[in-house]
């Protein structure tokens, strides 16, 4: 079981704050006509990975369900906090979970690494449940940790009720929030390696990746597909070309691969990253900060 660290205590405080905020906030997804209107929309955003510079967006602040792209947050917490080489016994509650599955068996031994790859390559809902229990002791406690981590990342219009993305009226995000979560995840070396893997042969399981972008888009680096009837087709993608990496989110988009490719194409065709040496950076009050650092800015090509 995950032992609370100083960051864990911070997450607990964030979770309590989230509960207070939810008592006074009603996102578009959760209100009668507003909810129906939101669910009929698609949303998208594209951002440069490191700076968060927005390249394109549409309905990026509309609250929507996100299906299995939820697992980006689940995986991030596992990558940050768990020993991937630890061998565990599959918890009973992870056997026979609804939806996509890696077909875990009662009493089965498996390491956390194979569960993580099963989560992100095969979208196993049973794997998500097992990892939640391994990390936090229970699914409910894990969702508290997910919500706290979302707040730490500035995803204030996001709320998780489960680690897999199964439909629930109180389980939602926005394209902007999900992009912030994905950008943080893609800067974690372990996460990045997992979602960029096409085929995995582990100690206990072998998987192929469902994400077609890895096979069909030049420079693709990740990250996660998702689908439920309620959420529609959802995809978080990332790709790198010419020293620039872009992350895109599309929610409730029938042609999720085509839309993601179009967002990436637009970004690479119209923007570039400039890395500028910054010898003297001053803060308010005249205090010198970070001499010799490099400044990273996103520029429109030809500007």
What are these model-derived regions, one by one?
Residues 1-35:
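Gram-positive cell-envelope targeting signals
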Residues 11-12, 68, 219:
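Hydrophobic alpha-helical transmembrane segments of integral membrane proteins
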Residues 28-176, 183-187:
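Active-site-adjacent loops and short helices of periplasmic peptidoglycan-processing enzymes
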Residues 155-159, 167-303:
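Domain-terminus/edge residues, biased toward the C-terminal soluble/receptor-binding domains
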């Amino acid at each position: 079981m995950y032992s609370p660290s100083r960051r864990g205590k911070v997450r607990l405080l964030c979770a309590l704050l989230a509960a207070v905020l939810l008592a006074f906030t009603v996102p578009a997804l959760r209100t009668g006509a507003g909810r129906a209107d939101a669910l009929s929309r698609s949303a998208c955003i594209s951002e440069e990975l490191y700076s968060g510079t927005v390249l394109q967006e549409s309905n990026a602040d509309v609250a929507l369900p996100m299906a299995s792209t939820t697992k980006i947050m689940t995986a991030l917490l596992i990558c940050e906090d768990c020993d991937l080489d630890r061998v565990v016994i599959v918890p009973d509650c992870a056997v026979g979970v609804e939806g996509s599955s890696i077909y875990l068996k009662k009493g089965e031994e498996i390491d956390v690494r194979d569960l993580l790859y099963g989560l992100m390559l095969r979208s196993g809902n049973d794997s998500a449940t097992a990892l939640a229990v391994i990390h936090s002791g229970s699914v409910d406690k894990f969702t508290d940790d997910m919500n706290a981590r979302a707040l730490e990342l500035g995803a204030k219009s996001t709320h998780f009720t489960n680690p897999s993305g199964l439909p629930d009226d109180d389980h939602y995000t926005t394209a902007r929030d999900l992009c912030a979560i994905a950008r943080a995840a893609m800067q974690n070396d372990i996460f990045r390696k997992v979602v960029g893997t096409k085929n995995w042969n582990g100690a206990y399981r072998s998987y192929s990746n469902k994400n077609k972008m890895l096979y069909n888009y030049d420079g693709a680096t990740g990250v996660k597909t998702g689908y439920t009837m309620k959420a529609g087709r959802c995809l978080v993608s990332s790709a790198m070309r010419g020293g620039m990496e872009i992350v895109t989110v599309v929610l409730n988009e029938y042609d999720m691969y085509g839309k993601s490719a179009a967002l990436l194409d637009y970004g690479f065709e119209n923007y570039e990253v400039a890395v500028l040496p910054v010898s003297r950076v001053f803060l308010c009050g005249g205090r010198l900060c970070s001499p010799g650092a490099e400044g990273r800015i996103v520029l429109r090509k030809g500007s």
